[in-house]
A protein has these predicted regions:
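Predominant activation on well-ordered alpha-helical scaffold segments within soluble catalytic domains
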Residues: 1-2, 29, 83, 158
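Extended amphipathic alpha-helical segments enriched in small hydrophobics
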Residues: 1-4, 164
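Internal maturation/activation junctions in enzymes
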Residues: 4-47
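Short capping micro-motif at the N-terminus of alpha-helices
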Residues: 41, 54-55
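Catalytic alpha/beta core of large soluble enzyme barrels
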Residues: 48, 55-171
Length: 171
């Protein structure tokens, strides 16, 4: 999401993804042959996701970032010395509402990179269209995505889902 070449800003996104998929599949087959192993069944996916995206300060998958500023929470086991260390350092924390006796939740303020795409920068339809392009031209499976929908967009989203019903999964 943070690389314009891999977003709707690239007018040739469909052909870019198709070519990259061809190369990835061919490379997988070539190296499987060289190593004498079966080729992977599915090699294309949308990354980074979750924890890895945090390590490299990247948007997760094809999700737009939530906002320019947000609070990231991390859970720590109360028996873990790192949890006690973080508490001793004054990192904002509170007991987990589900496991208050055993888990502490730490809160970290996060600032998105300058010019990062956030959920308010794209309409729900733009988010869905980009997801559909990735499904059709990159992923060998169904990519997942979280779509942020404004109150006035629900009818258009419903129409999009109806029009693409046979392709809808992971949204």
């Amino acid at each position: 999401m943070d690389n314009p070449l891999m977003t709707m800003k690239n007018k040739a996104l469909e052909s870019t993804l198709s070519k990259l998929r061809e190369v990835a599949v061919a490379t997988n087959a070539e190296w499987a042959g060289r190593l004498g192993i079966n080729a992977s069944v599915s090699i294309t996916c949308v990354k980074p996701s979750g924890t890895v995206s945090q390590l490299v300060d990247s948007a997760s998958g094809i999700h737009a970032r939530h906002s320019p500023y947000y609070v990231r929470t991390v859970r720590g086991d109360n028996k873990d010395p790192l949890t006690q260390f973080m508490m001793d350092q004054g990192i904002p924390n509170e007991p987990c509402v589900f496991k208050g006796d055993t888990t502490t939740v730490f809160s970290f303020p996060v600032m998105s990179p300058h010019r990062a795409v956030t959920r308010n920068d794209m309409s729900a339809i733009e988010q869905l269209e980009m997801w559909l392009i990735y499904q059709r031209y990159w992923c060998e499976h169904k990519p997942s995505v979280t779509i942020s929908v404004r109150d006035d967009e629900w009818l258009a989203v419903g129409a999009f889902v109806y029009e693409h019903f046979d392709e809808m999964s992971g949204v």
